[in-house]
């Protein structure tokens, strides 16, 4: 049975007075919370004077849920007791008078904590001509969700039911683990796919296809002289169809993301909600203990929501024209990614989300670097034009909290941009596509490649000035 809860001003969700809380003035970000919790051995006090940070924030007495939507007319929080549940156990209505701060919706739910399952649901105009695609029936993934649970459920009634978001406690005993800070010029980076690297019986992994399985491969990586592993996408991505049917070949590599803050649940040995968070951290800690850094292949250029014919899963149903680049005819999506849509990375709201996401992975997961897929998209303004000194690229390179982090660009996109040799400033490294292509052509036996091979082996002076 669905219980519809509505908090009136001055009342709790269940009709009692709000518990006494200490009002803490100022602002903190979600990546600061683990340190705050360790310092105080508790969860931070409920912040009633502002709506930040985003996502699901655990407090001693409950959880605060914060989401951005400019054009929503109504926001709801759907709470579930079980991963397999098709309908929510509780529906919490945000009060636009007391739970909305500008374009931020924020509500506190007492009596729940880590492990709680949830979706957002937003009502608003369905007006594709203005780029608005609100669907009051859609179950929406929190853009800041730190873990997902379950799979897409069969849409027998026409309603897509995506994996549920999980409220996550960020605490983990790192036992003094820190970033390794290997010099990039001395790094040997091994690109691997978590499942593909460990799933075959020949890998001799005790937990094949998982983060924990990677730990069993550390002696092999050390024997190769590897100093860093670059993990192909581990941000949450769908592996079954949106209608709940399965396809083992769908999105195997993971380059069709669903939730940027959440490690992929399919790589966890333990299927319980949120277990992937702990297992990912165990993997990073073990790799660091062996002197091996962890670099993530991140796909901030598009999502699995696709174009105007794609499903409403998260961003589309919260604020479509902010999160995505749209054509002048705003019914349609600009497609610089070749995957149906393009994330609007230099919009201030989206830029902030990406910025917080990078900090989240560095500070909560201790990752050592990022390889940015189709990074030239990050150089496009909100109209899709390539611009000098793009705000997002500059912000990533200048962030003092990412100063020890390796940042590597795949400096092109699917719409003709090619910035190898000129992406960002000296803070950015690049994948050298010319090196890859010329070495392949040489080994294939193409004529006239000896000189080009020499140029690449000598450092590509035609691209990079000493």
What function would you assign to each model-found segment?
Residues 69-74:
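Short proline/glycine-enriched turn/loop motifs at strand-loop junctions of beta-rich domains
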Residues 122-177, 239-256, 310-336, 446-466:
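Core domains of carbohydrate- and sulfate-ester-processing enzymes
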Residues 145-146, 366, 379-382, 387-466:
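Conserved alpha/beta catalytic core and glycan-binding cleft of carbohydrate-active enzymes
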Residues 76-78:
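Beta-strand signatures of extracellular beta-sandwich domains
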Residues 61-65:
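Structural beta-strand segments of beta-rich domains
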Residues 193-212, 216-367, 371-398, 417:
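Substrate-binding/active-site clefts of carbohydrate-active enzymes
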Residues 28-60, 87-91, 100-104, 108-191, ...:
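The feature marks proteins involved in alpha-glucan
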